[in-house]
């Protein structure tokens, strides 16, 4: 993922780079300056993101966020787990998407992932009863490479 700075346009709205270190950041698309009281969109409770839609750059629905995975040792968000397909959690496939591979669109209230449906379906996924060992460096590196995202742990 390329970093952005305040004022860089991306699709619709304005993108604002957010994070504590340069390089790997979540992009926020939409309102450059929040006029609402409260913490968001720069600081949000993880459970408020669960259930959010994920769309691609063409606006096609890809899935929804089911979990936010934290790297507790580094104090970083590592992945968003996205559910694709199925009905009411039955028959869906899960994907761990590097946090830095997505953008948050506050105007449309969704995440944006630069991947078409075919690319996503070919991505390394898993089912709800067989999660990968996400702390495994080989697995983590391959997921970041698949999405073209710089690994968050390289920032420290």
PLM-predicted stretches and their roles:
Residues 1-156:
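Peripheral interaction segments used for macromolecular assembly
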């Amino acid at each position: 993922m390329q970093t952005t700075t305040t004022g860089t346009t991306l699709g619709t709205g304005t993108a604002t780079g957010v994070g504590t270190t340069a390089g790997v950041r979540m992009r926020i698309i939409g309102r450059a300056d929040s006029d609402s009281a409260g913490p968001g969109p720069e600081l949000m409770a993880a459970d408020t993101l669960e259930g959010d839609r994920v769309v691609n750059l063409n606006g096609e629905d890809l899935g929804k966020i089911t979990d936010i995975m934290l790297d507790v040792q580094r104090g970083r968000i590592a992945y968003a787990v996205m559910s694709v397909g199925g009905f009411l959690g039955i028959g869906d496939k899960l994907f761990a998407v590097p946090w830095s591979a997505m953008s948050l669109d506050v105007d449309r209230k969704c995440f944006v992932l630069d991947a078409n449906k075919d690319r996503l379906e070919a991505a390394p996924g898993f089912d709800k009863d067989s999660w990968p060992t996400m702390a495994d460096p080989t697995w983590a590196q391959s997921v970041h490479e698949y999405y073209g995202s710089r690994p968050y742990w390289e920032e420290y």
